[in-house]
Amino acid sequence: MAHVLARRMLLAAASLSAAFVSSGLAAQTYRDRLPQDEVVYFMLPDRFENGDTANDRGGLKGDRLTTGFDPTHKGFYHGGDLKGLTARLDYIKALGATAIWLGPIFKNKPVQGAPGQETAGYHGYWITDFTQVDPHLGTEADMRGFVDAAHARGMKVYMDIITNHTADVIAYKECPNSSCVYRSRADYPYQRQGLNPGFLGDQVQTAENFAKLTNPNFAYSVTVPKAEANVKAPAWLNDPIWYHNRGNTIFRGESSQMGDFVGLDDLMTENPRVVAGFIDIYGGWIDKYGVDGFRIDTARHVNPEFWAAFGPAMLARAKSKGIPNFHIFGEVATSDIDVALLAKHTRVDKLPTVLDFAFARAVYDTVAGAAGTDTFTRLFDNDVLYEGGVATAQQLPTFLGNHDAGRFAHFVRMQNPKASDDEVLKRVILGHAMLFTLRGVPVIYAGDEQGFAGDGNDQDAREDMFPSKVASYNDNKLVGTKATTADSNFDQAHPLYRAMAKLAALRLANPALTRGRQIIRNYEEKPGLFAVSRIDPATGREVVIAFNTSTAVITRNVEVDPKSRGFRALHGVCAPQVTVAGSYAVTIAPLDYVICAAGAAE
């Protein structure tokens, strides 16, 4: 495998300059695309492809508790890296992806956790050094090579960033060997026992006020291990004064923004010094690599004032570097169809967009589950709640599953334990048809196109694309294939890969599916028809998309624009003419969909 990848890397390097010239149209114009024009492919680099075995241990020596490397354990580094990702760019491009969302690539604390419960920072969310690439994933040159190779192919690069916390370095003397309960501002004020005289609290967010916050021991007695006293970068991050230091969050009330996320050092993002510091950190990555967007981890756990400063600063920084359509989307995790919660973070926090967790839940309920298709009205009718309304909703990244919640195929099997392999495949394809054709920006989670299902959430949903050595991955039954995760899973003939590639091509070829206004046409209070029209913004012509979430054939009349008379099939069987002006008949097989494009008005 290593020599094959090396050859692929050499060929990619040799053709890079030619790509700028010969396939240059996409490469020259990718900056002009709006966020809703993209198809996004998301992966954790450690689990994608191993292009350089020399960096598997991150330059460290010792066992897995020192290096973090153990390819047989689902909670440690497995060897994937930036060189491997670069070598597989053509695979991603052939799928139809136009942007790559790269899991965090910053230097992480290799291993953390209580004795016997240690795991590694393979996922990228335990950062110690915000200024360099994790040595397990490669070098700055590897990052530059990846970004340049993606851009040469007309593909954008989105970085996954964190401002809420760092790795777990700070400890509290009161609870050295256990979880430290959250201590509130009311019970443990900043000026407790005469500390920090004159400090007016974190709600007065001025440099003058925070200059009076000099002692971090207001809630707990803070300590930092000597071996880690200078482990963080930039160096200012090593001072505990820049952190909340109040113990673990309980994910509600003030602890949601001020508590340590499962022990991780929670940054005091109310402090202007922290705000300025992170604007400088992430602005530097834009300057250095010309990346095209940021996914913001744990965005809901950071105070709104931080985002009100950070977001505009990043957009301005990107624009100054010739990146006019920089895409920022925050993680506001929810397991409900709670559009109000998501929208609040675009209005109060001023985040440009957020990941559409409500969309994922709606598809889960209707396609994996058996909820009525009226579920989608709860989702789309509330698009007006977002700052900017439906225009913002068009730019929300939509998804079906991810590395935290789990994979969509897993949800399908959990909700349909007696379903045949064919039914599971049909439900997974139907869910992705919704993902690619309904409003929003579709995000594919790496491995979904190869039928990965996983055993659940988090570590159980982070399988390797390259041959895995994890037993609990390799015993999984994949969807649409006889392969297992013990194999290399980059099969472009896989039925899910082919289905997604076709959907991506349809989406990218039809502006109605990227920039078009969406009109809900039909829905039911049971499994069955859900239909929408997407309107081409240039021609005004509609594309009718109709889904059947039931296990029976359905024939229904769908309301259409009275000017729409003739139709052509983009997918499935479409009647060539309307029944009568304003009414179009569709027949849809079980767990299937049709896409019918109206011609010129008669």
Protein language model features and the residues they cover:
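Structural preference for beta-strand elements that scaffold enzyme active sites
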Residues: V40-F42, A99, K156-Y158, G293-R295, ...
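Active-site clefts of carbohydrate-active enzymes
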Residues: A393-D421
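Substrate-binding/active-site clefts of carbohydrate-active enzymes
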Residues: D32-V39, D46-G284, K288-Y289, F310-K319, ...
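Short, solvent-exposed loop/turn elements at domain surfaces
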Residues: F48-R57, G406-A409, N474-N476
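Conserved, mostly hydrophobic/aromatic
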Residues: M43, I92, L102, F130, ...
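Active-site-proximal helices and loops of the catalytic beta/alpha 8
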Residues: V147, H165, P176, C180, ...
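Short, flexible loop/turn elements at secondary-structure junctions
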Residues: L44-R47, F106, D134-L137, T163-H165, ...
